[in-house]
Amino acid sequence: MSNNVISPEFDEQGRALRRIRSFVRRQGRLTKGQQYALDTLWPAMGTDYQAQPLDLTALFGRAAPVTLEIGFGMGASLVTMAAAHPEQNFIGIEVHLPGVGACLASAQEAGVSNLRVMCHDAVEVLEQMIPDASLALVQLFFPDPWHKARHNKRRIIQAPFVELVGRKLAAGGVFHMATDWQPYAEHMLAVMSDAAFFRSLSSTGDYVPRPASRPLTKFEQRGQRLGHGVWDLMFAKTV
């Protein structure tokens, strides 16, 4: 597998271009189990970055609705969803290798075969590899909220990114977001409300109750015990 999570970009003089990224890659230590999963399971379930569109039918060996999750962490929720919906295809993107290894190991343990994972910048994957109008669902759960005002520009939910997601979703496809930081939830709602090609699936025009399709994580359960809130937003592509 490739260990480059971003592709270098240069100007006409060959100088590296700086691009604002929504993540900081933390070099966590791989456990022996995670390394073993990467070594043995990546050939079957891993997909290396390439700057050309994927043939999703060939990737999975069948045509089926595709769910793409951005930033799946250790992969517990993603594997649970893939196991619960064998009739669907799932793609997970995560930049942290320990999480990718853990996800692969969990998928093997669960007997999941309808999941493919990538270790690369999700924006580049969407731009270069995911065909337009090919996704049924895009999931973005608990992205880094970048709490400090001077870092807000790093938040992944910005108008250009929402437009990119909109291009990749099929008509009627859904963009599902969740955050435990209320200011970020309000930011998400403001950006999504300004996107002309999305409509809210909330009966009140803002947030929705956690759908049964999104597994409750241990992190979220702990937050609930401490009285922390979680905000889910679901928007459907209209055109």
From Swiss-Prot:
Pathway recorded for this protein: tRNA modification; N(7)-methylguanine-tRNA biosynthesis
EC class name: transferase
Binding residue positions for substrate: K148, D180, T217, K218, F219, E220
GO CC terms of this entry: tRNA methyltransferase complex
Sample GO molecular function, one term: tRNA (guanine(46)-N7)-methyltransferase activity
Alphabetically ordered keywords of this record: Methyltransferase, S-adenosyl-L-methionine, Transferase, tRNA processing
The reaction(s) this protein catalyses: guanosine(46) in tRNA + S-adenosyl-L-methionine = N(7)-methylguanosine(46) in tRNA + S-adenosyl-L-homocysteine
Binding site for S-adenosyl-L-methionine: E69, E94, D121, D144
Cysteine-cysteine disulfides: none
Function description: Catalyzes the formation of N(7)-methylguanine at position 46 (m7G46) in tRNA.
Family classification: Belongs to the class I-like SAM-binding methyltransferase superfamily. TrmB family.
NCBIfam families hit by this protein: tRNA (guanosine(46)-N7)-methyltransferase TrmB
Subunit structure: Monomer.
Name of the protein this chain belongs to: tRNA (guanine-N(7)-)-methyltransferase
Organism: Sodalis glossinidius (strain morsitans)
